[in-house]
Amino acid sequence: MRLILWLPVLVVVLLMVMEGPAPAQGAPDVASTFRNIPNSLKEFGNNLKDTFESIPEATRKLMTSFAEGIKNFRIPLL
């Protein structure tokens, strides 16, 4: 009975051993990485600028919606 239970495990282990080690990852090209840094920084700066420019409009919309909510708020009479 034990042999029947261990047989699938043995098959899987043998398949893993026969497969061998996983292939190594290729080394990244350092020169292309350094060439891409200025573009990445420029894109990050543009995204940051756009985000900060949208803050006043988003704040204005939020305050307007709060003002509308307060204006429409009614306290029920007891």
From Swiss-Prot:
Protein name: Apolipoprotein C-I
Function statement: Inhibitor of lipoprotein binding to the low density lipoprotein (LDL) receptor, LDL receptor-related protein, and very low density lipoprotein (VLDL) receptor. Associates with high density lipoproteins (HDL) and the triacylglycerol-rich lipoproteins in the plasma and makes up about 10% of the protein of the VLDL and 2% of that of HDL. Appears to interfere directly with fatty acid uptake and is also the major plasma inhibitor of cholesteryl ester transfer protein (CETP). Binds free fatty acids and reduces their intracellular esterification.
Family the entry assigns: Belongs to the apolipoprotein C1 family.
Signal sequence, start to end: 1-26
GO function terms (MF aspect): fatty acid binding; phospholipase inhibitor activity
InterPro entries cross-referenced by the UniProt entry: ApoC-I (IPR006781)
Keywords: Lipid transport, Secreted, Signal, Transport, VLDL
Protein localization: Secreted
GO biological process: lipid transport; lipoprotein metabolic process; negative regulation of cholesterol transport; negative regulation of lipid catabolic process; negative regulation of very-low-density lipoprotein particle clearance; triglyceride metabolic process; very-low-density lipoprotein particle clearance
Coiled-coil parts of chain: none
Gene Ontology cellular component annotations, sorted alphabetically: high-density lipoprotein particle; very-low-density lipoprotein particle
